[in-house]
Swiss-Prot record:
GO terms for cellular component: cytoplasm; extracellular space; vesicle. This is Cystatin-SN. The record marks 32 as: Reactive site. Belongs to the cystatin family. The gene is CST1. It is found in: Secreted. Gene3D superfamilies: 3.10.450.10. Pfam families: Cystatin. Residues 1-20 form the signal peptide. PANTHER family: CYSTATIN, CYSTATIN-SN. Its main location: secreted. A motif (Secondary area of contact) lies at residues 76-80. Disulfide bonds join 94-104, 118-138. It comes from Homo sapiens (Human). GO terms for biological process: detection of chemical stimulus involved in sensory perception of bitter taste.
């Protein structure tokens, strides 16, 4: 009986250690699954910059827009990488013809800010140096 209890306690201790060391459910990366992207990651930053650049090319506004804040960033590894961004963008005081648009200040007057909530989907195949904007949807916020 004592040997049975010892074996049972050893199994329970092993299980407890395994569960403590296993990653949390939200940290697990499932192949093909969508998970939160690290905004400090260089590839994520490149994808976001690409989305904003394509967005600015498509707008008829003379003024450059850039992210006010990123609400959510996710990614999915498939035959490349899908990036999904939910971003609040704002209108800057810089026209699109000016250099170094990333440092442009935002309009301070509310009627000129023209904030928008945008969702972008980017598909990238890094080893082929290929990137495309799959979806782009924006609405006034």
């Amino acid at each position: 009986m004592a040997q049975y209890l010892s074996t049972l306690l050893l199994l329970l201790a092993t299980l407890a250690v395994a569960l403590a060391w296993s990653p949390k459910e939200e940290d697990r990366i499932i192949p093909g699954g969508i998970y939160n992207a690290d905004l400090n990651d260089e590839w994520v930053q490149r994808a976001l910059h690409f989305a904003i650049s394509e967005y600015n090319k498509a707008t008829k506004d003379d003024y450059y827009r850039r992210p006010l804040r990123v609400l959510r960033a996710r990614q999915q590894t498939v035959g490349g990488v899908n990036y999904f961004f939910d971003v609040e963008v704002g209108r800057t005081i810089c026209t699109k013809s000016q250099p170094n648009l990333d440092t442009c200040a935002f309009h301070e007057q509310p009627e000129l800010q023209k904030k928008q909530l945008c969702s972008f989907e980017i598909y990238e195949v890094p080893w082929e140096n290929r990137r495309s904007l799959v979806k782009s949807r924006c609405q006034e916020s």
